[in-house]
């Protein structure tokens, strides 16, 4: 699983609508494959976060399949880590996809427990 940034949104959309049988998506979008660390599956070098998984179960849902997987590794580009070694979501420009639309992520809404803190 390669997380998507705003810079990669166009390439992500292209890769989602084009078939790998018809076009070399990496070449067309100038993407580069890199070796996985814990799995024998390539990752996208330009992605700031690569999540490596092993498929445990495939559930057939009629129109599509749902994959249940175990996360066996996570690689994060150093530029997205803060000084304490934590992932800095604000600096990544990550994108989410929902119901055919892309959304920018990253605005901090609060810290865990903020809903019950005394004022």
Residue ranges and their predicted role:
Residues 1-119:
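Basic, polyanion-binding surface patches
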